[in-house]
Amino acid sequence: MSKASKQTTYRVDGMSCTNCAGKFEKNVKNLEGVTDAKVNFGAGKISVYGETSISQIEKAGAFENLRVTDEKDYSSKPAKKESFLKKNWHLVVSIIFIILAFISQNISGEDSTTTIILYVIAIVVGGFNLFKEGFANLIKLDFTMESLMTIAIIGASIIGEWAEGSIVVILFAFSEVLERYSMDKARQSIRSLMDIAPKEALIRRDDVEQMIAVSDIQIGDIMIIKPGQKIAMDGVVIKGYSAINQSAITGESIPVEKKVDDEVFAGTLNEEGLLEVKVTKHVEDTTISKIIHLVEEAQGERAPAQAFVDKFAKYYTPTIMLIALLVVVVPPLFFGGDWDTWVYQGLSLLVVGCPCSLVISTPVSIVSAIGNSAKNGVLVKGGIYLEEIGGLQAIAFDKTGTLTKGKPVVTDFIPYSEHMDEQNSLSIITALETMSQHPLASAIISKAMIDNVDYKSIEIDNFSSITGKGVKGEVNGITYYIGSSKLFESSLEKSQSISQTYQSLQKQGKTAMLFGTESNILAIIAVADEVRESSKEVIAQLHKLGIAHTIMLTGDNNDTAQFIGKEIGVSDIKAELMPEDKLTYIKELKQTYGKVAMIGDGVNDAPALAASTVGIAMGGAGTDTALETADVALMGDDLKKLPFIVNLSRKTLKIIKQNITFSLGIKLLALLLVLPGWLTLWIAIVADMGATLLVTLNGLRLMKVKK
């Protein structure tokens, strides 16, 4: 590989905005020895092509005090946290001076020297970084959002509207704080993925067992996993039998039985037996490593949508300035107009053209809507996501923990014995399960406790596990069995009705177990992941809102998925999916429908959440990674909040359009008043301030939208 084509990836701490990331990328590209560079803002990474040093890269990011670390040496431990006050002192100080200015204004008046000085300090402190960027862009005639905000604040200051200027500064500074917080949390969640799998494993080499770091484990090594341990590497079982909790990887709610030749994944939990596993992948190729990579790549692909106002400013602001200049010079030079009159008209046009109402029209609506959604238990991580929800054409749901409760419970108990009632049967079943360490034992024990079944007094003798079938034990000299149909093949052949019931429960996506003696089946007990009571109602509401495409995605088997999907009423069902399958399907949905949301709660959902137009997590049941990777979190595990946020988003979009239309309409009307020379500074101020006030009040209406 040539030096020019050599690629090195570095972790970057301190990137707080997309503009900073773009500037950093440009600076690195200009370094000697670097042929190209690409920043992944979402993951906090930069890929550098060519050869350079970390010190040189850090110099390229010195304007933001960026800290750079080679990804190979990067620690998964979170960086030392700075306090909110330390990181955002400029915002806090600015707010304090605005409060002091309000007090001074009420005592001494808005034109008093003290009031003006306090407002000036608030504007300078809160908007210092904004002004630096804004003026730099204006010098280059690059009319970005920063330059638009700078002109808005200066315009407000020139006409003496110090309060308005300071509020605009605060709104912009606060939006930057939210952006930085969201990105910091997202990066922390990605780092936490690295801690799912152990950093070392017990490996047998040449009949010697030793702990070896995962980076030194080779394909073909024999890994020994004891009960209760997490699996460090992907591999295939060569000896042993166990139940593996792999919900963090595949999303399956119920631990999966693993036997010889079955595949196991790094980061999953061995709950029951001793396993020997042959390693099949290097650490960088494991399933969990792929998930981390997919999350970071998906985050990097999502470019921040440029708001309409930011795009419009490139044409609006210079156009207003040009028109004002023409108003000042054309009438006096070519038509003999009075200079004083037309300078006044030009100044009035600049005042009415001040984009304050235009600038505020969107953020006031977004802030109000986000505040309302938070009060109603929906956390939205940015205005762009709130806007995107309003245009959703399809929503994909993870099954486990989202449409279902994510916790197995006993759904059916069917007794068949005339001599043993349900209480006695359940007491023996529970006593056996407490000794078995079966993955579903917790569901049976919970039912026994709810039904006040006395199972602790049952004495079990000669207990033993029957590998791959179930367990058995003696109670008062009678041997009882509980397990799969393999334990009762002869009894099932004799009873067609019991066999049909058992098969029917299995087809419903439930895990059915038989309880009985060597000669008779005494009961069937079925366990399943319960559907949330609200799921069917929520899907119906979404269909009424016009979102016709609702898709259930799951790692569970097809029978379970089909039964639950039809019960809930989703329009499509996709089962037996791995994380990469979910990601691929989300990308396909985006190509078909445009704007697509993904709702999930597990680590396996993280790539799909990141790749969707809007990633939505179930708060409470959701893992930290899903919550932080997602753009929206439904707190309290309440799926019913989904139709609310869709409705709120649509109303937000409607009000934003109203505000922008009204703001521009007022300015157009004022422009028409220039032609006959009727525009006065008083009319300009009233029009500008009136528009600002009205769009603000209109935006605040979003605080009142209810569920």
UniProtKB/Swiss-Prot annotation:
The keyword Ion transport applies. Gene3D superfamilies: 3.30.70.100, Calcium-transporting ATPase, cytoplasmic domain N (3.40.1110.10), Calcium-transporting ATPase, cytoplasmic transduction domain A (2.70.150.10), HAD superfamily/HAD-like (3.40.50.1000). Keywords: ATP-binding, Cadmium, Cadmium resistance, Cell membrane, Ion transport, Magnesium, Membrane, Metal-binding, Nucleotide-binding, Phosphoprotein, Translocase, Transmembrane, Transmembrane helix, Transport. One of its GO terms (cellular component) is plasma membrane. Belongs to the cation transport ATPase (P-type) (TC 3.A.3) family. Type IB subfamily. Residues 6-69 form the HMA domain. This is Probable cadmium-transporting ATPase. Its EC number is 7.2.2.21. SUPFAM superfamilies: Calcium ATPase, transduction domain A, Calcium ATPase, transmembrane domain M, HAD-like, HMA, heavy metal-associated domain. Its main location: membrane. The active site is at D398 (4-aspartylphosphate intermediate). It catalyses: Cd(2+)(in) + ATP + H2O = Cd(2+)(out) + ADP + phosphate + H(+). It is a multi-pass membrane protein. The lineage of its organism: Bacteria, Bacillati, Bacillota, Bacilli, Bacillales. InterPro entries: ATPase_P-typ_cyto_dom_N (IPR023299), ATPase_P-typ_P_site (IPR018303), ATPase_P-typ_TM_dom_sf (IPR023298), ATPase_P-typ_transduc_dom_A_sf (IPR008250), Cation_Transport_ATPase_IB (IPR051014), HAD-like_sf (IPR036412), HAD_sf (IPR023214), Heavy-metal-associated_CS (IPR017969). GO terms for molecular function: ATP binding; ATP hydrolysis activity; cadmium ion transmembrane transporter activity; metal ion binding; P-type cadmium transporter activity. It is found in: Cell membrane. Cd(2+) binds at C17, C20. One of its GO terms (biological process) is response to cadmium ion. Couples the hydrolysis of ATP with the export of cadmium.
